[in-house]
C-alpha cells in the first residue's frame, strides 16, 4: 500500500500467481538456512500478514483495534522489522489454571495497570525464539482463559528495547561450538529461545 518495495513475506497476495511468488520467497528463506531456523523473520511476519488478510474479523469486533493492527502491520512492514512472539505461559503448577497459580498472580504476564495512555504489563511469557536478535515482540495468550482471568487476556506489540523488558535466554549453542568446521550448524543457525519478563512495561 505504500508503493515501496518490501520483503515478499509481508505481501498480501490477491491472486494465485502472487501466492506462488510469496511461497517461493519463503522457500528461499528455508533453503538458505537448510530448514534449521523454525522462527526466521518470515514466521511472525506471515502471521501478521494473515491477520491483515482477515481484517474484517477484527473490524467486526472493534474497528479501533482493527485500525491499530493495520497500523502496526504497516509500521513493521515498511521498516522490515524482525518480530518474534511469546504466547506460552510459565506455570509452577501445570495442574492448575492460569489464574490459580498460587505463588504470584504476576508469575504470568498480565495487565497490572491501565490508564488513558495504555496498559502496564507485569510477569513472564515464553518462548521468545530469536528474541535476542528481534526488533519487536508480539505478546499474546495462546490458551483458553476462565472468567476472572481477564487480566491475562491481552495482546500487545512491544519493542525489544522497551524499558523494563528483561530477556532470559538459554545458553547459546554457538558459544559452545568448537569451530565452524566441527559445528557447521550451531555456529551459524542458533535462535536462542528466551523467557521474557515484563517488569512494569508500559505499552
Task: Locate each region found by the language model.
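FAD-binding core of flavoproteins
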Residues: 85, 90-203
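Internal helix-loop-helix
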Residues: 2-83, 130-131
